Amino acid sequence: MITRKASLILTILSLLAGNALAESIEDLPGVAAHVARAQEIAGDEFGFIASGLLCGPAEETIARAIRTVPGFLVPDAPGIEPMAFFDNLYYVGMYAWGTFVLDTGEGLILIDSLTNEREVEEILLPGMAELGLDPDDLTHVIVTHAHVDHYGGAAYIKETFDVPIIMSELDWQDLAHDISYPYFVRAGYPEVVQPVRDERDHVVEDGEVLEQGNSRVTFYVTPGHTQGALSMFIEVQDGGETRTVALWGGSALRTEVKELSQMHNSLHRFWEIGRELNAEAVISTHAWLVGNFKQHERGRVDGKNPIVIGAGGFDRIMGIYDECMHAQFARNRAAD
């Protein structure tokens, strides 16, 4: 019979063995070389990306985020001060995740929707009011992918403001298999209301363009993070100039070989399109992950928007993603 003390000792030994294995895998040349290359591409400007969650072991992402990202999987996490990234593109949300509001001059497009009614009522709507944006002007809710922190508030927004929800067909289907849902349940979130799959408001197609007012959003289905993750290029206004901003629809890497391979293929396609479109910025509704908060805090220097990193900056961030994915491929091979 195993005593409770013996059981605890076995558990500790198992954890230590697991940590030792993880550390030994990280030291393997195939892993370390790709992480080092990601850090080389990043330099000082983007070093936080290469040394953060993105390039670490994918199986540890959630646990590390809980430890290091303020408000991650905290049901009553507060909102942060809403901020303008561009003249007509605003971040509203918490630190861990948020939304973008695109003011097209002919209505507002919302990108992602927080997790539930509470976050919409207590964070999104007051944040929009602070920016002088009227939720009655919302025309669309774009859901980048079928995880709770992106779709959770969409059904409530649709019902309250009569706004259609935009998702890819694959992610409308994938709602039933959302791998993030159990994490939110275990963390104590109130019931999450999913968009009704049989009432697909708008099924967006790969390459589809949404033109409205002074803005243009071009969608690409980029499977990997989820089967139907939506990435997009958004035309925004910046001091009288029109700029193209890249939004990669799902950042955290998957451990499964199939999904990771899909994500890698999707990245290279998105990367090439971004080069053709001269993408000059990379944003995320997990804004901390790509450094948007750090950029915004710097403020304008000589009138230059700190979110704008130029075509070279876009290229470097895509290169960091690429090397981090190769590092995860190497981890997977080592663990087999």
What do these predicted regions represent?
Residues 12, 16, 23-72, 239-242, ...:
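Accessory terminal helices/loops
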Residues 75-131, 231-252:
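Conserved beta-strand hairpin/beta-sheet module of binuclear metal-dependent hydrolase folds
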Residues 78-79, 84-87, 122, 133-137, ...:
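Metallo-beta-lactamase
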Residues 107, 136-139, 161-164, 215-218, ...:
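Loop/turn elements at helix/coil->beta-strand transitions in domains of secreted/extracellular proteins
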Residues 118, 146-152, 172-175, 227-230, ...:
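Active-site environment of divalent metal-dependent phosphoester hydrolases
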